Structure formats: C-alpha cells, structure tokens
C-alpha cells in the first residue's frame, strides 16, 4: 500500500509488483499445477491428476451429511502419507492401509469395510469427514502422490 501511495504522490507512471498475503501454488499456466486431487461432494467422485494426466477417477463416500460430519470444502495440500494407520475418533477405531490427510484429521483413505461407493450413501452412512475410497484406487493414489500435492474439495 505504501508503494502505491508513493507512486501516486510522485505523479509519475510506475510499475509496482504487488505484495500478497497468500500466493497460489504456482503462478504460471494455472495456479494449482498439473498434479492435484479434485473431490466433488455433490457427485461423490474424486479425480487424481499427475503431471496433467488423469490417473484415478473413482466414486467415493465423504462425510455423513445428516449427522453434520460433512467433508470441509476448500483448497488444501496432502500433509503426509502413511501405510497401515489406525484412525481413532468418537465411536470408531479403524485400520486403513493407505492414509493421506489433507486437513486436520480429514484425509483420503481406503475403506475396505464398504462394498459400494458414490451416489447418496454419504447422506446417511457417510464417514466422519474423510474421503472413503475403494482399496485399489487409494493404493494407486498413495503410490503416486507426494506431500504438498493440492487437494481441491467443492460441492
């Protein structure tokens, strides 16, 4: 702001580089990059792009809507990844083979206890906020994703 005011006061034409509180993951092309996870809550579907190529497209089950455990929308990043994790919370203690958290205790993981994904399952039988994913797709994402990869969650 000071630079802009100084430029105005000087009365001369100037080029000023803006200063940002937050910046995009990158500035060239698009801001999110070529490797990212996209999750549509309304479609109960997840896509994983790596180097611009669609690697995984899968139905998922997200947070239980009727219990108020909706998966949070926003833009996040994979915090870390872990094999053979135990997820513990109110009323559950679940082993998962592939755990990729992206926001607090919310993440992408396999859900071997489910035999179907997608549709309206999340309305009454959804997760506590995580993205339940079929085993083979969670495995493929896990084997191809790194810490810091953007995760975009939207309705």
Residue locations for each model-derived region?
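Exported/periplasmic cell-wall-interacting domains
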Residues: 70-73, 84-155
């Amino acid at each position: 702001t000071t630079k802009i005011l100084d430029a105005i006061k000087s009365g001369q034409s100037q080029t000023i580089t803006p200063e940002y509180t937050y910046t995009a993951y990158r500035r060239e092309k698009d801001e999110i990059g070529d490797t990212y996870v996209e999750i549509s809550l309304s479609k109960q579907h997840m896509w994983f792009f790596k180097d611009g190529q669609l690697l995984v497209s899968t139905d998922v089950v997200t947070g239980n809507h009727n219990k108020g455990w909706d998966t949070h929308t926003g833009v996040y990043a994979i915090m870390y990844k872990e094999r053979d994790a135990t997820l513990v919370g109110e009323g559950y203690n679940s082993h998962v083979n592939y755990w990729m958290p992206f926001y607090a205790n919310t993440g992408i993981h396999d859900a071997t206890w489910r035999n179907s994904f997608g549709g309206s399952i999340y309305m009454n039988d959804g997760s506590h906020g995580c993205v339940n994913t079929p085993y083979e797709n969670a495995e493929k994402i896990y084997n191809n994703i790194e810490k810091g990869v953007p995760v975009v969650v939207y309705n």
